[in-house]
Regions:
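Intrinsically disordered or low-complexity boundary/linker segments at protein termini
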Residues: 1-17, 128-147
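Structural beta-alpha unit
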Residues: 70-104, 141-147
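General small-molecule cofactor/ligand-binding pocket signal
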Residues: 36, 80-84, 135
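Small/aliphatic-rich secondary-structure junction motif
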Residues: 1-49
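Glycine-rich, Arg-bearing micro-motifs that act as flexible, cationic patches
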Residues: 106-129, 143-146
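Acidic, proline/glycine-rich short linear motifs
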Residues: 28, 37-63, 143-147
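Short, hinge-like loop/turn segments at secondary-structure boundaries
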Residues: 50-54, 98-100, 122-124
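Short secondary-structure boundary segments
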Residues: 37-38, 107-109, 138-139
């Protein structure tokens, strides 16, 4: 169970809450991790159609993924990375299926109706469409996984 976990990262502080939980779970279960970040800016969304080069933001996102993966690998975990481009919910679900992940891990920000209308909700879309279990960790809540 949970041989490959897709970990959706935001390249932000919320990841600091998620990663300790997921790395602990991966060690307990012997799971592989697939870190994904979905670049969704203009350049990312039009990358293929216009033959664009990676934007500064996309280069920074790739560096962040590789750095985070390196830290987790140093801790003894098997980690791959994926920088996707486009609509975050669609790319998360497509990548999870493509790589045969059996768990998706994400952070939730605890928005309510108004916040979701302004910010959108990747989680809402993913949880309604996913056929794979989802583990949600509340961002910004200081916690440590059990030892």
């Amino acid at each position: 169970m949970y041989k490959k976990i897709l970990v959706a990262l935001e390249n932000g502080r919320a990841d600091e809450t998620l990663l300790p939980h997921i790395s602990h779970l991966a060690r307990l279960l012997g799971s592989e991790l697939l870190l994904i970040h979905v670049a969704d800016g203009w350049a990312a969304r039009n990358f293929e159609q216009l033959g664009l080069a990676e934007s500064e933001e996309m280069i920074g996102d790739r560096d962040y993924l590789e750095s985070t993966a390196g830290t987790l690998r140093t801790g003894g975990l098997h980690v791959d990375v994926c920088l996707a481009r486009g609509n975050p919910p669609d790319e998360i679900l497509k990548t999870a299926e493509q790589y045969h992940c059996d768990l998706i891990a994400m952070t939730t920000h605890g928005h309510r109706l108004f916040g979701d209308l302004i910010h959108g909700s990747t989680i809402t879309s993913v949880r309604h469409k996913s056929r794979i279990p989802i583990l949600l960790v509340r961002a910004g809540v200081p916690s440590t996984p059990p030892s």
